[in-house]
């Protein structure tokens, strides 16, 4: 049965649409107008516009109400909407339409990476509650991390990203692996303390990061737990270890280079202090407190079992 809503709003960014914004908007609205009696398009001109819209909506400053949100853009645009919804405790479901380089969480939602196809698939979507990471006072749908992933993001040239897309990250990743920064870390979780040296720590809620699937069979963004991957060294065997599929019960028994910690709350400290990547946005430095908020947002997804 097709999804149908009374009033919806589509947020989009000027850089969305995978190279052709207005063509993408036309394709997307063709599907979304079939889902909504009333559809509004809202351009995000500056960072923070979408979150502020959610703040104003909570205070009823907009004078209208909506029963579905859509967002066309990359992970950063999606992250802003998730923050606006989560911090205002809105119960409005979100439909994510890929319009950036990776759009990792759309893979978790079983949506096509192609803009028009994903919008069309939403016609037959279902609504499901998903967990969210709270990193200090910021929310993350997919991941948070330090180390090589931050180096990678900071070193990607904006022009190369525009021209090469995903390949720009590949080139930068190879350089970072060859010369990573090493940190002393302390993690407090599960009434225990973990410490040592690391080149990267990934705190995952979603199944995909940087366009690649995390090889943990029982990882789920709806299980009430976050999965912390601590990369102990930085040689090429680390990469081989990470991409061998395992389950959480056997991970630490068969993987020497990457420690797995599963929890719903943690504190991370590093020496020296370092920047943290939150769903592709680098916002502040360690130390950080991270909590897993169960069923915090509602998203449209495709049930592949039907």
Curated annotation (Swiss-Prot):
The active site is at residue 281. GO terms for biological process: phospholipid biosynthetic process. Keywords: ATP-binding, Kinase, Lipid biosynthesis, Lipid metabolism, Magnesium, Metal-binding, Nucleotide-binding, Phospholipid biosynthesis, Phospholipid metabolism, Transferase. Binds 1 Mg(2+) ion per subunit. This ion appears to have a structural role and is required for catalytic activity. Mg(2+) binds at residues 220, 223, 225. It comes from the Bacteria. ATP binds at residues 44, 74-80, 101. Disulfide bonds: none annotated. Belongs to the diacylglycerol/lipid kinase family. This is Putative lipid kinase Sca_1050. It comes from Staphylococcus carnosus (strain TM300).
């Amino acid at each position: 049965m097709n999804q149908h809503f009374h009033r919806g709003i589509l947020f989009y960014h000027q850089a969305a649409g995978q190279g052709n914004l207005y063509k993408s908007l036309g394709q997307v609205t063709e599907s979304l107008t079939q889902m909504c009696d009333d559809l509004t398009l809202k351009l995000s001109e500056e960072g923070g516009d979408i979150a502020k819209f959610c703040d104003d909506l909570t205070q009823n400053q907009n004078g209208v109400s909506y029963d579905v949100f859509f967002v066309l853009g990359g992970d950063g645009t999606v992250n802003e909407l998730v923050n606006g919804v989560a911090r205002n405790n809105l119960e409005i479901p979100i439909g994510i339409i890929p319009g950036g380089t990776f759009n990792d969480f759309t893979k978790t939602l079983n949506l096509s990476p192609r803009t028009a196809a994903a919008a069309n698939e939403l016609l037959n979507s279902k609504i499901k509650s998903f967990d969210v990471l709270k990193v200090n006072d910021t929310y993350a749908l997919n991941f948070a991390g330090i180390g090589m992933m931050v180096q990678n993001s900071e070193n990607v040239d904006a022009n190369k990203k525009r021209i090469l897309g995903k390949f720009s990250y590949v080139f930068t990743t190879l350089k970072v692996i060859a010369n990573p920064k090493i940190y002393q870390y302390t993690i407090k979780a599960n009434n225990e303390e973990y410490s040592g040296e690391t080149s990267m720590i990934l705190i995952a809620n979603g199944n995909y990061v940087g366009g690649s699937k995390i090889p943990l069979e029982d990882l789920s963004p709806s299980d009430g737990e976050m999965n912390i991957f601590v990369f102990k060294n930085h040689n090429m065997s680390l990469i081989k270890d990470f991409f061998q599929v395992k389950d959480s019960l056997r991970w630490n028994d068969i993987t020497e280079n990457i420690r797995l910690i599963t929890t719903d709350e943690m504190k991370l400290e590093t020496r020296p202090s370092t920047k943290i990547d939150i769903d592709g946005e680098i916002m502040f430095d360690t130390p950080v407190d991270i909590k897993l908020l169960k069923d915090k947002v509602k998203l449209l997804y495709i049930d592949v079992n039907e």
